[in-house]
Amino acid sequence: MTVTEHRPWRGVLVATALPFDEDLRVDHGRYAEHCAWLVENGCDGVVPNGSLGEYQVLTPEERAKVVETAVAAVGGARVMPGVAAYGSAEARRWAEQARDAGCASVMLLPPNAYRADERSVLAHYAEVAKAGVPIVAYNNPIDTKVDLVPELLARLHAEGHIHAVKEFSGDVRRAYRIAELAPELDLLIGADDVLLELALAGAKGWVAGYPNALPRESVRLYRAAVSGDLDTAKESYSQLHPLLRWDSRVEFVQAIKLSMDVVGRHGGPVRPPRVPLLPEQEAAVRAATEKAVAAGWA
């Protein structure tokens, strides 16, 4: 089966939160259980070592073991690790590690140690593509200051470096331009709070944050949206949006982990330099999550 036929990045892939114990050590047992629980509750796969997974504060040994833990829990076909790094050679090594662990695809940010120009972006993706594992580009110009605009995405796709893009710019208009320039490039919803808009624009998947806490309702929302069941999708989306919008805020990791705690999962602490939510932030997240629980969505 070809990469184009398989497309393992389609569907609901959860950018997994990473559990730490009280001493801030990675709890691999809890992480394995969490990955399995997400799949059991309808999610199509997991994305370890993304921003939500706090990969920036992991040691290389921890980061590698997180991938191996996810693969052991749900199988490599369901695992798409983030392989971001400051250098192209290091990112390629992470892609090779994912490949050797059995992962079917990887997710890659552009260079983000500085504001890379187009030639640097092309060279970066070309180098990591040498690992031989399909790449999903991750466009997050808000945090990286490097914007994978539709024209650049089309070129990356035409040169065979990427097969899909996680689109986190917040500009839903881009979906239509991407479809015009690169119709075979899969668009993945990259921010929870534009899910409905991008689903209607033809998205093929969702790299998601809030299913960490509410997988069944999140999957129901996604399936309704992409199938055109707008009555179901709009009602669910409107009710969940007070939570979903936290995925686009600076405190998204803390918010999603708190929601996990509220619904009875283990979200737990974050590693520094992240700090706990302010009292008013915690109250808002807790209230919105408790409302979702009362509605039977957890």
What residues fall within each predicted segment?
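Active-site beta->alpha loop and helix N-cap motifs at the rims of alpha/beta catalytic domains
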Residues: 2-145, 155, 298
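Residues within alpha-helical segments
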Residues: 71, 92, 96-99, 176, ...
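Short, flexible micro-motifs
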Residues: 14, 48, 53-56, 85, ...
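Catalytic alpha/beta core domains of metabolic enzymes, predominantly
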Residues: 131, 142-250
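A general structural signal for well-ordered alpha-helical segments in protein cores
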Residues: 31, 63, 67, 91, ...
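C-terminal alpha-helical cap/extension of soluble enzyme domains
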Residues: 2, 8, 13-17, 37, ...
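Short helix-capping segments at alpha-helix termini
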Residues: 72-77, 100-102, 131-133, 157-161, ...
